């Protein structure tokens, strides 16, 4: 059985709990490991469980440096009110693709918040 593909099917039907279980099996088998870690993290993000998503995103980044991995890590930190770590990850994502408008917007929002807080 291709756990990764079946997990994607569950993800696409918004059954995130079942998707997580199958992505974890895929990770154990080292099948599409970086993508499986990332997709598991995204399921946790969809479930608003940011604390569980963070270590998965960090592990996926050890395997593959990808803009969306850094961006979602930044998003998790924003949702947990850790603007400093969020900014670091958004800036890292932006260095990988300076044309990314979402990264630029996220960075601007955080920097503007810092400016307002320091007035």
Range-by-range predicted roles:
Residues 12-13, 46, 79, 109-116:
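Register position in tetratricopeptide repeats
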Residues 31, 64-65, 98:
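Short coil turns that delineate tetratricopeptide repeat
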Residues 1-29, 33:
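Alpha-helical segment of the N-proximal tetratricopeptide repeat
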Residues 25-26, 59-60, 92-93:
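Canonical positions in the second alpha-helix
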Residues 1, 34-35, 67-68, 101-102:
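Helix-start (N-cap) detector for alpha-helical repeat units in TPR-like alpha-solenoids
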């Amino acid at each position: 059985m291709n756990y990764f593909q079946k997990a994607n099917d569950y993800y696409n039907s918004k059954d995130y709990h079942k998707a997580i279980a199958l992505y974890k099996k895929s990770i154990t088998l080292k099948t599409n490991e970086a993508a499986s870690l990332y997709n598991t993290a995204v399921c946790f993000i969809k479930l608003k469980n940011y604390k569980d998503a963070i270590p998965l995103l960090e592990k996926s980044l050890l395997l593959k440096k990808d803009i969306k991995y850094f961006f979602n890590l930044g998003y998790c930190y924003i949702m947990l009110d850790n603007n400093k770590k969020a900014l670091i990850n958004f800036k890292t994502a932006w260095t990988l693709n300076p044309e990314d408008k979402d990264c630029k917007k996220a960075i601007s929002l955080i920097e503007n918040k810092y400016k307002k807080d320091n007035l």
